[in-house]
């Protein structure tokens, strides 16, 4: 029953968000600002394209976790950039231990948001270490990937999930390797 309740809750949230978006568009049209309505529709289209690219990775639990965090960032007017270099994951990363993994990822996003840099960069890729998610508040931290031996490994006791952190000044990056 818990799964059904979660599903219904998600549907209610999506319906609420959709109705809010319609109200914004309708408001622009009422005050005779069709350009504002078009810009808002364009913004929604770009946001949905980003979310769609994440779901193409074919891990719904992982995608839902990222979607929730990204939408929270957008609601708080934080710019989100997403770069995906793989077509899909080889396995479903969040299928096992979803609650633990999503709670940890949520904590990462909240920490980055609290730096007040108003940017979160998400990079999904694969290299010699495996399929990975890089989340940072500074896109330049992407260059630090080649120095992984200097990153701090975080032990969260979740199988098939390695987490590393790098930070200096107010710049923070996390790399999750699956």
What function would you assign to each model-found segment?
Residues 144-169:
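ATP phosphate-binding glycine-rich loop and adjacent ATP-lid/helix-beta elements
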Residues 171-178:
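Short C-terminal beta-strand
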Residues 78-85:
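Conserved transmitter core of two-component histidine kinases
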Residues 1-7:
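Conserved signal-transmission helix
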Residues 87, 96, 110, 114-145:
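Conserved beta-strand-loop-beta-strand hairpin that lines the nucleotide-binding pocket
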Residues 22-63, 86-88, 92:
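Histidine phosphotransfer helical core of two-component systems
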Residues 58-76:
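Short beta-to-alpha transition helix within the HATPase_c
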Residues 15-31, 92-124, 150-151:
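Conserved ATP-binding N-box helix of the HATPase_c
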């Amino acid at each position: 029953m818990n799964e059904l309740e979660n599903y219904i809750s998600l549907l209610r949230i999506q319906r609420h968000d959709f109705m809010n978006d319609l109200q914004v568009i309708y408001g622009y049209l009422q005050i005779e600002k069709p350009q504002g309505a078009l810009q808002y529709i364009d913004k929604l289209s770009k946001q949905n394209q980003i979310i769609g690219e994440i779901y193409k990775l074919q891990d719904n639990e992982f995608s839902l976790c990222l979607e929730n965090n990204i939408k929270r960032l957008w609601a708080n007017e934080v710019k989100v950039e997403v770069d995906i270099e793989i077509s899909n994951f080889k396995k479903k990363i969040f299928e096992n231990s979803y609650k633990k993994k999503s709670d940890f990822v949520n904590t990462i996003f909240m920490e980055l948001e609290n730096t007040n840099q108003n940017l979160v960069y998400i990079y999904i890729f694969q290299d010699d270490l495996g399929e990975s998610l890089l989340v940072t508040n500074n896109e330049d931290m992407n260059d630090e990937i080649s120095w992984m031996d200097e990153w701090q490994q975080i032990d969260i006791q979740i199988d098939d999930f390695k987490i590393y952190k790098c930070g200096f000044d107010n710049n923070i990056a996390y790399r999750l390797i699956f």
